[in-house]
Curated annotation (Swiss-Prot):
Pathway: Quinol/quinone metabolism; 1,4-dihydroxy-2-naphthoate biosynthesis; 1,4-dihydroxy-2-naphthoate from chorismate: step 2/7; Quinol/quinone metabolism; menaquinone biosynthesis. This is 2-succinyl-5-enolpyruvyl-6-hydroxy-3-cyclohexene-1-carboxylate synthase. Belongs to the TPP enzyme family. MenD subfamily. It is an enzyme of class 2 (transferase). The lineage of its organism: Bacteria, Bacillati, Actinomycetota, Actinomycetes, Mycobacteriales. Its cofactor is Mg(2+); Mn(2+); thiamine diphosphate. Its EC number is 2.2.1.9. Binds 1 thiamine pyrophosphate per subunit. The gene is menD.
Length: 541
């Protein structure tokens, strides 16, 4: 067995021993030893391999697999620009604390700076965006290297999981490979062996970060449950503004009701990413702000946080009048939103979000696109307790969302997956629908596209003010006029153009036995009245 083949075989074997079950692979020559080893492991049923031709979308596929599967997922590619295409997925994984492993093949280091083709200084390419950058030395005809290879894999997985730091995230694992890059079918030689019984070479225990924080909940307290939050039993019963991806610790509070409440104290769990009303409360110097996190970082955009911890030691009790006020105002806001939706003459993204949220049932998985869909979902309803909600909120970009939805659906076997996206988000990553024949496909993924022919979110921001109407449509509205049915046909994906009523019916109708695969349900919406619709809701409060 030649050195590169031996090294790749040991690395893949140790990844499996370390708990890896899904791997995404992009074709290339320099990563051929890894490709052969991964294909063999896939045929043996030790892992599931996903082939993709575009490294950028492949990175987000791996991200979706990792988020939904709650395991590290390697994405394997050749050298050069192939590695650089992982940049957006690495950024998202960093800020969302997702265990993504970028396993890049590299040229031998003596080729750097020589003008060799497809050769760049890729070690360290991701800088501070990864938890660790780990490289292997060039493989030699030396059986003693087996322990070094396997030990390095265990370090990679430990860093990705955050087992010693409490801070999961992406890792760059760079492996220089020297020719021959293909196995010698006539002289295989001994396979590098791991620990007996399939054990990992190095076992690492999960570190527990336990920092108690004293919290008196007698003052009027609001809990802000942000992305990545853990459920906090000690905060049960407290009024909570929860993002769709975050747990609801206590009494639900509609984000649009928050300006009317005037809390004296706010407790952050996770990282708030959505609402301006939340940001204003957290920036108010008259509000005492505390932060509870599960890792070493804590959010504090305004610099107002008084204390941090990983758990609260609660004293006191909330005033019953405060609890009742929060509940009453929130219920009033919920009704105002639904009333204005019913009165609005045309379908908007809010209407589509309401139809989707109302159709979800226990066991469903929902993936929300960035920009308006995740905000719309937060305004129309809080997900049912047994609906799993995902969204790329690390950096909150629209890129890679179709691929992330495909990955999430592939990793989730317990029920169906529904993705709610805007048209620009869908178009930005339409190549995520490209799945090769014979490749694993989602069993049941419905992608709902609210198509308002452009960037609806800008209608609600400062740029959407009528005084900028002469500039708005071209540079912010960005109408595209694309035929989504034709686009889906090119990818051989089922597509239906539906109204709100038909959307509700299709989402609420039980599936027939068997695999549905992927389907796209497109709803034509309008964005020109969004600003007025939101203003009408606020006027009812």
């Amino acid at each position: 067995m030649n050195p590169s083949t031996a090294q790749a075989t040991a690395v893949v074997d140790e990844l499996v021993r370390g708990g890896v079950r899904e791997v995404v692979l992009c074709p290339g020559s320099r990563n051929a030893p890894l490709a052969f080893a991964l294909q063999a492991a896939d045929l043996e049923g030790r892992l599931r391999l996903h082939m993709r031709i575009d490294e950028r979308t492949a990175g987000f596929l791996a991200l979706g697999l990792a988020v939904a599967g709650k395991r590290p997922v390697p994405i394997v590619m050749t050298s050069g620009t192939a590695v650089a295409n992982l940049g957006p997925a690495v950024l998202e994984a960093n800020y969302a604390r997702v265990p993504l492993v970028v396993l890049s093949a590299n040229r031998p280091y003596e080729m750097l700076g020589t003008g060799a083709n497809q050769t760049i200084e890729q070690l360290g390419l991701f800088g501070s965006q990864v938890r660790a950058t780990i490289s292997l030395g060039l493989a030699e005809d030396d059986a003693g290297q087996n322990s070094q290879w396997r030990s390095a894999v265990c370090r990679v997985l430990a860093a990705a999981r955050g087992t010693r730091s409490g801070n999961a995230g992406p890792v760059h694992f760079d492996i220089p490979l020297r020719e021959p890059l293909v196995p010698d079918v006539h002289a295989q030689g001994p396979v590098p062996q791991g620990r007996p019984g399939g054990a990992a070479w190095t076992t690492t225990q999960h570190a527990t970060l336990d920092v108690a924080m004293d919290l008196d909940i007698t003052p009027d307290t609001i809990v802000i449950s942000g992305h990545g939050s853990a459920l906090r039993p000690e905060l049960a019963g407290l009024p909570t503004v929860a993002e769709p991806t975050a747990p609801l610790h206590g009494i639900p509070v509609h984000p649009m009701a928050l300006p009317q409440l005037k809390p004296r104290q706010a407790v952050i769990t996770g990282r708030p990413t959505l609402h301006r009303s939340v940001s204003k409360v957290l920036a108010d110097p008259a509000v005492a702000v505390y932060a509870l996190t599960t890792g070493p970082r804590w959010p504090d955009v305004s610099g107002n946080v008084l204390a941090t911890g990983t758990r609260a030691v609660v004293t006191g009790a909330p005033d019953r009048a405060w609890i009742n006020r929060c509940r009453t105002l929130s219920e009033h806001t919920d009704k105002a939103v639904r009333a204005q939706l019913a009165a609005h003459p045309k379908a908007t993204g809010l209407h589509v979000a309401a139809a989707v949220m109302d159709a979800l049932t226990d066991g469903d998985q929902l993936l929300l696109g960035a920009s308006n869909p995740v905000r719309d979902a937060a305004l129309v309803s809080y997900p049912a307790p047994k609906v799993r909600v995902l969204s790329n909120r690390g950096v909150a970009g629209i890129d890679g969302t179709v691929s992330a939805a495909v990955g999430a659906a592939l990793a989730y076997e317990e029920g169906r997956t529904v993705a709610l996206l805007g048209d620009l988000t869908f178009l930005h990553d339409a190549s995520g629908l490209l799945i090769g024949s014979g490749e694993p496909r989602p069993r049941d993924l419905t992608i709902v596209v609210a198509n308002d022919d452009g960037g609806g979110i800008f209608e609600l921001l400062e740029q959407g003010d009528p005084q900028y109407a002469g500039v708005f449509e071209r540079v912010f509205g960005t109408p595209h006029g694309m035929d989504l049915a034709a686009l889906c046909a090119a990818y051989r994906v089922e597509h239906h153009l539906v109204g709100l009523g038909e959307l509700s019916t299709l989402l609420s109708t039980p599936d027939a036995p068997g695999d549905r695969g992927i389907r796209v349900l497109e709803v034509t919406t309008e964005r020109s009245g969004l600003r007025e619709l939101h203003a009408a809701v606020r006027a009812q409060l």
